[in-house]
């Protein structure tokens, strides 16, 4: 296993409450290209692809808006997505591309084949909900086919944490809004099965099954949507600190530092100019909760 003494020793200290970055996560990635082994850099790419998923959903929902958006993907190529989809529809040989296999599988199973069906046209509710269902399906493919099977315990555990957070919040929201949680829970382990069926406050999960279930329940009970997001990021930050405490010069420390930069970046970008865009992203992540919560947040933003 490679050790990165010089790189890690030279990293500036950062904290969860920081509002100023020593450098951007994107610049950090470029520097790491020259430092990490090819195998370790691939682990970084696995983490980076999680962010790219939302750009793919945006593109599938409205290619024109996605292409014109201010924020653009760093890894995903819209042109490659278009050419791969065209090849899938025509049944021709794939052009050269850099898309991960999970995205190819997703496009084939849930986009191209769906375009060939007409049964959505008569169901307005299904048409309206389809982008959200696509998001869930893409998350399923990302975690189960790409991130969780990663040959690195840290990457797999981090992916499990994020999947658990996503699923727990989906379960809470489904219960609150009268939705069927089976439509929104990703995965089919014993934990996911309990989230799909249990009506208990903690969904019948013990701390042995999910060590942070009590913390997530506490976060969910917070009514202020921005404070809730902040609590989640603190939970993630502390998780990262604990996981790399005894791995001082390993790649896991570098991966954790990258993820912590991303956490700080998300909050430094929350200003008057980008507040609404970030707000919409937060709402999408939380499964588009009740209009009352949304209106309350918007009123707070104007103060």
What are these regions (language model features)?
Residues 1-303:
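Extended alpha-helical surfaces
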